[in-house]
């Protein structure tokens, strides 16, 4: 049973990352390698912030914002500086490697006995008795579903429709008087925000040490 739960947890963790990659590779047709840097960015931020006593839920929000900033910078490099999409992602990925090490201060961070989304007083109270072994799986499932439904909601907004249109036919979007570059930047920001969240607190149930590099 432990092995099955672990597989489910890892699958749902990577499902959030897959949502972000789906936006860049499938919707925008943008080979974004920024995710190689924004993925461990979530680990670095979460480990540092929760070690300073920050609320775990707030850390998720901060991690998403940090990933969104990374995606925005990739978009700006591509759109404003006219750098090829693949190269702009490589530039940001390389920069984030240094940023992640700077944030963490070391190559790996211990996370023993820290208050996280999976180890706090509320979780111990709600998931007691027979539910205790399923606590991590249920929490990850809830977070994954929230991310999925929020993305579905966004994709049904005007901005979401424009995002899909840019990936299908940039000419139509331009003819509507919409800056396709701005839409690309928004898409990259959301995608990298999701990727960062996937490695924030979601790795904590499976390890006692977060690897940054």
Regions inferred by a protein language model and the residue ranges of each:
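Membrane-interfacial amphipathic/re-entrant helices at transmembrane-helix boundaries
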Residues: 1-17, 45, 52-58, 129, ...
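Alpha-helical transmembrane segments within multi-pass membrane transporters and channels
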Residues: 54-94
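Conserved small/polar residues in nucleotide/adenosyl-binding loops
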Residues: 200-206
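Alpha-helical transmembrane segments in multi-pass membrane proteins
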Residues: 14-18, 38, 42, 46, ...
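Short, non-helical or kinked segments that cap or interrupt transmembrane helices
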Residues: 26-42, 77-91, 159-162, 208-209, ...
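Membrane-helix/interface signature in polytopic inner-membrane proteins
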Residues: 149-189
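Transmembrane helix-bundle core of multi-pass membrane transporters
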Residues: 85, 89-92, 96-156, 185-186
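Transmembrane alpha-helices
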Residues: 17-20, 95, 174, 179-199
């Amino acid at each position: 049973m432990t092995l099955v739960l672990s597989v489910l947890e890892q699958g749902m963790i990577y499902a959030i990352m897959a949502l972000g990659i789906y936006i860049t590779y499938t919707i925008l047709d943008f080979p974004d390698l920024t995710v190689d840097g924004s993925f461990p960015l979530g680990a670095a931020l979460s480990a540092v912030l929760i070690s300073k006593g920050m609320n775990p839920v707030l850390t998720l929000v901060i991690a998403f914002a940090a990933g969104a900033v990374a995606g925005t910078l990739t978009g700006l490099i591509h759109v404003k500086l006219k750098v090829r999409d693949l190269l702009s992602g490589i530039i940001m990925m390389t920069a984030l490697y240094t940023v992640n090490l700077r944030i963490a201060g070391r190559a790996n961070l211990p996370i023993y006995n820290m208050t996280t989304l999976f180890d706090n007083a509320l979780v111990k109270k709600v998931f007691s008795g027979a539910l205790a072994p399923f606590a991590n799986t249920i929490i990850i499932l809830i977070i994954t579903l929230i991310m999925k439904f929020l993305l579905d909601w966004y994709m049904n907004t005007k901005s979401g429709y424009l995002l899909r249109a840019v990936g299908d036919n940039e000419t139509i979007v331009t003819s509507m008087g919409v800056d396709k570059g701005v839409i690309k930047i928004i898409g990259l920001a959301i995608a990298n925000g999701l990727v960062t969240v996937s490695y924030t607190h979601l790795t904590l149930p499976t390890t006692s040490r977060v690897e940054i590099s």
